[in-house]
Amino acid sequence: MIELTALAIALSMDAVAVSIALGSKCEEEIRQLALKAGGFFGVAQMVMPLLGFYLGVQLHDYIGGIHHWVALGVLGFLGLKMIREATQGEKELALSSHPSSSKLLLLAFVTSLDAMAAGLTLTLLGLPLWFCLLFIGGSTFLLSFGGVHLGRKSGTYLEEKAEYLGGIILILIGVKIFIEHS
């Protein structure tokens, strides 16, 4: 359960960083934006790992004996990518103070691509898939909701720190899985 909690927090950090950025630009209707962003990001973080999980099931015969290497590679790559983006300040989409639903959907998709890749590793947690998906999605909703409010109060200061922390957590989970299954 500790691994799932760490994974959920790490995967949600891109969404949290975007939520903080959205909140920093929000001039009014903060609660509505927080609910909307949390909803979009939470659902995307449930769906994308499911797609990754089913991709992993299809590839099981090919990667079954080296799954711990795959987990280390995928999570390590994603973690390093998040750290690089945080340190270089890369932003993929310009944010406005009133993002449309289509813009939020696009942001949710972009921020959940890492979750799809991480879905390949969900079987290694030894927990029911539905529980993992609900936990990851629910955690992302709550953290994104809070991120919008936090962004309103802190501006963009915390945005890159959230991505940096998420990257470190993903790398540590990958190393832990590798050590446990080697």
UniProtKB/Swiss-Prot annotation:
**Protein family:** Belongs to the MntP (TC 9.B.29) family.
- Disulfide links within the chain: none
Q: What does this protein do?
A: Probably functions as a manganese efflux pump.
Database matches in InterPro entries: Mntp/YtaF, Put_MntP
Q: Which residues cross the membrane?
A: 2-22, 37-57, 63-83, 104-123, 127-149, 162-182
**Species of provenance:** Wolinella succinogenes (strain ATCC 29543 / DSM 1740 / CCUG 13145 / JCM 31913 / LMG 7466 / NCTC 11488 / FDC 602W)
Query: Any idea where this protein resides?
Result: Cell inner membrane
Annotated protein name in UniProt: Putative manganese efflux pump MntP 2
Specify the protein's topology with respect to the membrane.
Multi-pass membrane protein
Provide GO CC annotations from the record: plasma membrane
Query: Coding gene?
Result: mntP2
Instruction: Give the residues annotated as coiled coil.
Output: none
Q: Which keywords belong to this entry?
A: Cell inner membrane, Cell membrane, Ion transport, Manganese, Membrane, Transmembrane, Transmembrane helix, Transport
Q: Name one GO molecular function term.
A: manganese ion transmembrane transporter activity
